[in-house]
UniProtKB/Swiss-Prot annotation:
Pfam families: Histone, Histone_H2A_C
Phylogenetic classification of the source organism: Eukaryota, Fungi, Dikarya, Ascomycota, Taphrinomycotina
Subunit and partners: The nucleosome is a histone octamer containing two molecules each of H2A, H2B, H3 and H4 assembled in one H3-H4 heterotetramer and two H2A-H2B heterodimers. The octamer wraps approximately 147 bp of DNA. H2A or its variant H2A.Z forms a heterodimer with H2B. Component of the SWR1 and INO80 chromatin-remodeling complexes.
SUPFAM superfamilies attached to this UniProt entry: Histone-fold
Amino acid composition bias (Basic residues), ranges on this chain: 1-11
GO annotation terms (biological process): CENP-A eviction from euchromatin; chromatin organization; chromatin remodeling; heterochromatin formation
Region (Disordered): 1-27
UniProt name for this protein: Histone H2A.Z
Amino acid sequence: MSGGGKGKHVGGKGGSKIGERGQMSHSARAGLQFPVGRVRRFLKAKTQNNMRVGAKSAVYSAAVLEYLTAEVLELAGNAAKDLKVKRITPRHLQLAIRGDEELDTLIRATIAGGGVLPHINKQLLIRTKEKYPEEEEII
């Protein structure tokens, strides 16, 4: 009954030890959801003259991207919740980004299917009689 084939091989250097930690991704080490390795690859591809890219720069860039994405998704989720729907659409993204002053200056892109912000000029609004009683006397 020698180990002829179907069982798990336990011997050698690759045996499981209690204190041994397996491979961890750069994202897991940094506690991020965004892929640090992919961000590093993109940074290396976009640099000129084959300049080197530090490991911490990719982690920092991934953290910034993750924070901005979470911020936009939170605001868009609030906009969707206000409209009593469960799915975030480009319209909700548009309302969230244009509603926040800092995100509006950061993201100046046109969002396809986002529509426009609702705005009515004050001069076009109908004046009520309580606010302007002197007009009532003239008429």
